[in-house]
């Protein structure tokens, strides 16, 4: 034990001499490798060098910092508990062993959920009286990535202030480990997803009887991760008549790029009409993003997942809804249709949740297919999104494409502009805001300018010298033209 601790501390002091944000490296295969540490956790590519990739030693250092922060937060010597789950990435089991062992050496009990989903871990934290949680997933990043995503005692992502404390603890590296008589326990928990599904079935707005009566046939693309466990289990519990599984074995060998964008979804878009399914369901590796495919093989629209769920919920519970500044205007339109109100937050789940709490919102989310239902928990949850969407479709009748046709039709474009690292990005965005001050642009997160029938959102990256340009307009051509126009304006400024 003493030799292990000496090695860990030597490694930690080596790691913290390096910058704490983005550290690119070329491996022996000449592939760009990256480690990104931020207030929400640490993510990176597996392999390569310490401090430049997500290596075992980086994982130990970051887990140690999190464990020490939890101890400080508790303000006592009581036994701490952490819930931990992972997606199906091939590096996940080994990474889990490292993180669990590190926390145990800090005297922390770990409730190991094994293969799980991000929303399941989030819910298990308060259910099990845990002091925090860790999700091992790089979300929609490719399979050579992994990450430690950190939760507080509410099962929510950390605030910027708390995240900064963990980064500081990692930089200082003065970790204290427990004597052998006080090592934490590893406790296997095997029913997390079942409990999550039961909580969804208990919601008043989820009508399993209506879904069962409709006799749905549904195709599922789970990208060979844990959605292949959770989504079919949920559909069976809801009474879905037939499930066509596509990549539902959680091998972690992603069959296509795991980000649920149209260009990656040819297989399921073909499978749905070929097998005469009523719709298709696509989730990302950790099951917090949700995309539907209509019966004709066309995407329902990632931005419209939240719109459809809001349409259903606001008919029963009018109130306030929240999305981020880069999400479609369609959510605001639907809120107005139901005599409800809308506001936008900065990009990022933690900001959406903060705005929801401030406004007492009944629903929130992000345009990437993330649904946040505070009645269940404050986290993006594809499972509850599926249950609410199917309930609505079952109750109203008709097809997915017919439902989609009832919503305002907007098109989005996303671009990025590379900058010289010496450029003051904040000053550049400020000049854009001044140039359009008559339109009262939002500066909550970069600059967002609303025009009568379109908008543009410019925001700097926290990890790269670029500005991201998001636009929405009545047609795809107009959205792309607006993005090009503002890229040119940025260049001229």
Label the model's feature ranges:
Residues 27-101, 105-106, 186-218:
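An N-terminal, well-structured beta->alpha segment
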Residues 113, 165-198, 202, 294-367, ...:
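Proline/glycine-rich low-complexity loops and linkers
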């Amino acid at each position: 034990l003493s030799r292990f601790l000496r090695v860990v501390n030597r490694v930690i002091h080596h790691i913290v001499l390096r910058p704490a944000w983005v550290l690119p490296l070329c491996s022996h295969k000449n592939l760009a490798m990256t480690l990104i540490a931020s207030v929400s956790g640490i993510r990176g590519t597996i392999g390569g060098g310490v401090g430049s990739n997500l290596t075992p030693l980086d994982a130990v250092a970051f887990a140690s910092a999190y464990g020490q922060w939890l101890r400080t937060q508790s303000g006592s010597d009581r036994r701490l508990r952490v819930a931990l789950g992972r997606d199906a990435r091939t590096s996940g089991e080994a990474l889990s062993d490292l993180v669990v062992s590190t926390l145990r050496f800090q005297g922390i009990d770990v409730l190991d959920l094994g293969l799980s989903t991000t929303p399941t871990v989030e819910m298990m934290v308060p259910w099990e009286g845990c002091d925090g949680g860790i999700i091992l997933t790089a979300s929609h990043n490719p399979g050579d990535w992994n990450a430690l995503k950190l939760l507080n005692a509410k099962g929510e992502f950390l605030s910027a202030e708390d995240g900064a404390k963990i980064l500081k603890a990692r930089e200082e590296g003065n970790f204290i480990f427990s004597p052998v008589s006080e090592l934490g326990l590893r406790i296997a928990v095997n029913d997390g997803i079942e409990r999550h599904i039961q909580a969804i079935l208990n919601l008043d707005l989820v009508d399993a009887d209506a879904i069962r009566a409709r006799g749905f046939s549904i195709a599922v693309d789970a990208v060979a991760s844990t959605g292949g466990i959770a989504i079919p289990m949920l559909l069976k519990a809801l009474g879905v008549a037939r499930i066509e599984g596509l990549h539902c074995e959680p091998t972690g060998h992603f069959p296509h790029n795991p980000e649920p964008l149209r260009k990656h979804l040819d297989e399921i878009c073909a499978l749905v009409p070929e097998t005469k399914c009523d719709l298709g369901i696509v989730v990302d590796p950790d099951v917090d993003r949700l995309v539907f495919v209509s019966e004709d093989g066309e995407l329902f629209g990632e931005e419209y997942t939240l719109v459809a769920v809001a349409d259903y919920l606001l008919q029963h519970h009018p109130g306030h809804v929240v999305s981020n500044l880069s999400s479609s205007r369609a959510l605001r339109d639907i809120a107005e249709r139901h005599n409800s109100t809308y506001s936008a937050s900065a990009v990022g789940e933690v900001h959406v949740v903060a705005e929801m709490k401030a406004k007492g919102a009944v629903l929130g989310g992000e345009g990437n297919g993330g649904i946040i239902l505070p009645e269940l928990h404050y986290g993006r949850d594809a499972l509850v999104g599926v249950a609410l969407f199917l309930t609505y479709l079952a109750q109203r009748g008709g097809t997915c494409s017919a439902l989609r046709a009832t919503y305002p039709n907007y098109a989005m474009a996303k671009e990025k502009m590379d900058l010289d690292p010496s450029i003051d990005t904040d000053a550049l965005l400020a000049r854009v805001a001044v140039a359009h001050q008559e339109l009262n642009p939002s500066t909550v997160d970069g600059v967002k300018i609303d025009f009568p029938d379109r908008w543009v959102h410019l925001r700097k990256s926290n990890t790269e010298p670029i500005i991201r340009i998001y636009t929405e307009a009545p047609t795809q051509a107009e959205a792309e033209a607006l993005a090009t126009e503002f890229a040119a304006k940025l260049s001229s400024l």
